[in-house]
A protein has these predicted regions:
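Short, Lys/Arg-enriched, disordered terminal segments
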Residues: 1-4, 74-76
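N-terminal acidic leader/helix
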Residues: 2-30
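Exposed, low-complexity/repetitive linear segments and helix-based recognition motifs
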Residues: 4-7, 12, 39, 51, ...
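Ampiphathic alpha-helical segments that act as solvent-exposed interaction surfaces
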Residues: 19, 53-76
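Polar/charged side chains located within well-ordered beta-strands of beta-rich proteins
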Residues: 2, 35-37, 67
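Acidic, low-complexity, intrinsically disordered interaction modules
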Residues: 22, 26-60
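Generic beta-strand hydrophobic packing signal
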Residues: 9, 35-37, 75
Length: 76
């Protein structure tokens, strides 16, 4: 398993990080399993595990962040 850090997600809260909508989207669309959420002031990070190579996930990181932002806007 590879650990992936999805960083700098504005507006992310622990409630959104734990939401079934976000969990389902990341697991079904990107094969990412959320392992945790880290918030230190301005930094918001989702920690995920995956069997997919990190270099491949990084190619889709912009799309992943856009999808997460769409969920944040939908929840708030």
């Amino acid at each position: 398993m590879n650990t992936i850090y999805i960083e700098n997600i504005e507006g992310l809260t622990s409630e959104i990080a734990k939401s079934s909508k976000l969990i389902n989207m990341l697991s079904s669309k990107y094969k990412l399993l959320i392992q945790g959420y880290i918030s230190t002031g301005d930094a918001h990070v989702i920690v995920c595990n995956t069997n997919i190579k990190e270099s491949i996930i990084n190619l889709f990181m912009e799309d992943i962040i856009k999808d997460i932002n769409n969920i944040i806007r939908g929840i708030n």
